[in-house]
Structure formats: structure tokens, C-alpha cells
């Protein structure tokens, strides 16, 4: 299945629920007035875009409508698509400029973190990059085993220690291996942590110190994996992790299983954190690089 078709299918629930309602609402109006904008804002908020972002979209839409002299409500959809694509632009590409580069993957348990790492490793390997996986989620034996399966599937080397080992020591070993084997990217799994588990946040700080000491000039990404089905809770999680540890990007999983795709806008506009990848299915190649234009097109289903 093609790249665009995958995203389009993955956004079907959001498109049907949110964009479908917007489309019906616009058809019920014969002119563009305050009531139309109020209803649009309400529908955007219901679509998990968030109140501040919904207001921002509608204010920009008002200005564009006025400036371009648009009178027909049916013309609003294409403007809305443009505004949303513009809002999502910036920072969506991974920074992997150095060899090795390092990607630290964080998130609470149950969001699809280890699966995301496996799919990302597979995608980068397909691009010809030599990838090493670091099994630094040492709290759960199952996490190490799961990562081993993904390492095998994506044909990547895995660096691991036994359950309960010091996660920072695993990262140190992975960095040493990457230097010795001239690897391009190290992807590090970490324990599923909640913002309020102080020892887990301390552990993350220790991991960061090891990375900064051993790879001071390396390109570093800190990716937070979020479950799209949790809607505004995902936005709250992103804010808490951002404050605690700093985040360079978001991987939004399970978009295909929810009508809450609007959280992409809430995260990028509300928090200023770019979405770098989206998960739109169960298959190994269903983790897709996030591209604002393709996302907006798929959401409004303009192109086939």
C-alpha cells in the first residue's frame, strides 16, 4: 500500500467523525457568519484539537475569508486544510546528522514504545543505516525479550544486560559498540516512566549524563511515544515530560484506532513539539514519517 493511502486509511476515524461533521455543518450554511465560526470552533474542540488551537484556527480563517473576499461556505474546507498544514510545519524530520546519532525513546507503559522502536529501526535499516538497539528498559524482562524479537525482525544488533541492570550501563555499552562497529544510529529503549516517578526521572537524567559525556557532539533526539487514543491526556503527558526532561519530538501511535487525530494539532501548536512519526497500523511498515501536507490532505481526503 502506498504512503498516502496508508495515512488516509489510518485517519479514517478522525476524518469520518471530525471532518465529516465539519463538512455537514458547512453545507447547512448559505453564508459565512459568526454562527458558522462558532460551530466550527466547537467541532474542532470536540475533535481534540484543544480550545486555544481551535480559537487560533478560527481567527486565522476569519482573516483569510475577509482578506480573500470569500462568501461561499463550501470554500472554507480548502482554506482550513491549508491553515492546518501550515500550523503543523517545522521540525518534523529526525536529526541524524552525525555517526553515530542517538535516539532516546521515552513514554509510559502501554503506548507502544518498544514496538515503535522496532518499526523505527526497521525503517532506518531500510534507508541503509547501521542501527544498534539499546535495551535500557531493564525493569521488565518482557521489554528486553520484546526488543530482541524486533532486533531480529529489523536485522539490527541489540545491546542488553540482565533484568534489573543499570540502564545507564546498557546505554554506555551500546555507545561503545556503536563506536567500535561504526554504527549510524543508536536507538535506546527506556523504562516506561510516569512523570511523578522521581527515581525514573533521576534514571533518565543519569542516562543523559552518560550520553553527553560519551557522545558530546552527536545529534540527539528525545522522542516521546504517545497513544493517540487517549486524546487530551496525551497532550497533558507531553507537557509533563517536556517540563521534566525536554522532548525533541513526538511519535503518535494508534492513530488508526481513534477519532482523536486532532491531538496532533494540540501538541504541535499548543506545546511547540513537532510530531516526527505517526503509527497508522500493526504492520512493521505502518510507522510513517510525519509530513504536514500529506496529513492535511489525508484528513480532508482531497487527493486519492
Language-model regions, residue ranges each:
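Structured loop/turn residues at secondary-structure junctions
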Residues: 136-139, 163, 229, 255
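Primarily NTPase-proximal linker/entry elements flanking Walker-type ATP/GTP-binding cores
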Residues: 17-136, 143-164, 169-188
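Residue-level signature of catalytic and energy-coupling elements of molecular machines
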Residues: 11, 48-50, 108, 137, ...
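Electropositive phosphate-/nucleotide-binding environments in soluble metabolic enzymes
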Residues: 12, 34, 51, 55, ...
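Conserved catalytic-core segment of NTP-binding enzymes
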Residues: 146, 167-181, 195-301
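Short glycine-rich anion-binding loops that position phosphate/pyrophosphate groups of nucleotides
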Residues: 191-193
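Charged, compositionally biased N-terminal leader segments and the immediate start
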Residues: 1-25
